[in-house]
UniProtKB/Swiss-Prot annotation:
It comes from Bradyrhizobium sp. (strain ORS 278). The lineage of its organism: Bacteria, Pseudomonadati, Pseudomonadota, Alphaproteobacteria, Hyphomicrobiales. Belongs to the universal ribosomal protein uL2 family. Residues 222-277 are annotated as: Disordered. GO terms for biological process: cytoplasmic translation. This is Large ribosomal subunit protein uL2.
Length: 277
């Protein structure tokens, strides 16, 4: 889908660049596949802010998206493509041959009326699902499982994908968008194709108010705060903080490594950080 620009009637309109969503379904979502979603405003059960700069925004309902795709060898037809406020990608409503409805992540080049299927050996075409070990090397995939049967966790944002670049015994080697190469078990499943809405990265919000509609509040700098609020706070006049940049909780920011999960290090063949040097 193309990008939309607007006549510069206001500064916000002048800078606004949106994805043209005119081809998407304009009605309400399927009620059986939606549930209520309560806004937390970034507060936890004690009422304290646990996530800063969240709150407000338009009320949303959650669409239950099927990331597992575990109805094996039951063909499904794409009924329509829909907007989902909970994610950057579009979703597709599919109807299985037995009459069941489900929402899935819509891949690129999936159209209304297409037939998709999940199985051990299926055609390599967008929307089909099969174990990574049965896919040809070089296949573009998204919604990749990390644990067998848990449901897709990798490559789910708009326009993202991963590529199968090799095999290693029971595992396959997957190259992610970040440049990281990692081992994933061959029995983990993935969906063929790249995620829809690749133009999302080229959009421009245009004005602060539109960000407020999305539920984001103003982001304050630490150096503009008082010492009680941030390690960079305080000082007479404008100061640069006087110490190496840290988070509000005193941990070094600007590139300090925080990953501690050593048990899964063996699955990462090429770090996304090493690639950038």
């Amino acid at each position: 889908m193309a990008l939309k620009t607007f006549n510069p009637t206001t500064p916000g309109q002048r800078q606004l660049v949106m994805v043209d969503r005119s081809a998407l379904y304009k009605g309400k979502p399927v009620k059986a596949l939606t549930e209520g979603k309560q806004s937390s405003g970034g507060r936890n059960n004690t009422g304290r802010i646990t996530v800063r700069f969240l709150g407000g925004g338009h009320k949303q309902s959650y669409r239950t998206v099927d990331f597992k795709r575990d109805k094996v060898d039951v063909p499904a037809t794409v009924e329509r493509l829909e907007y989902d406020p909970n994610r950057t990608a579009f979703i597709a409503l599919v109807k299985y041959q037995d009459g069941e409805l489900a929402y899935i992540l819509a891949p690129q080049r999936l159209a209304v009326g297409d037939t998709i299927v999940a199985g051990n050996y299926v055609d390599v075409k967008p929307g089909n699902v099969m174990p990574l070990g049965n896919m040809p090397v070089g296949t573009i995939v998204h919604n990749i499982e990390v644990k067998i049967g848990k449901g897709g966790q990798l490559a789910r944002s708009a326009g993202t994908y991963a590529q199968l670049v090799g095999r290693d015994h029971d595992y396959v080697i997957v190259r992610l968008n970040s440049g990281e190469q990692r081992l994933v078990h061959g029995r983990c499943r993935g969906t063929i194709g790249a995620v829809s809405n690749p133009d999302h990265m080229n959009t421009s919000i245009g004005k602060a108010g539109r960000k407020r509609w999305m539920g984001r509040r103003p982001h304050n700098r630490g150096v503009a705060m008082n010492p009680i609020d941030h390690p960079h706070g305080g000082g007479e006049g404008r100061t640069s903080g006087g110490r190496h940049p840290v988070t509000p909780w005193g941990k070094p920011t600007k590139g300090k490594k925080t990953r501690t999960n050593k048990s899964t290090d063996k699955f990462i063949l090429l770090s996304r950080h090493k690639r950038k040097k």
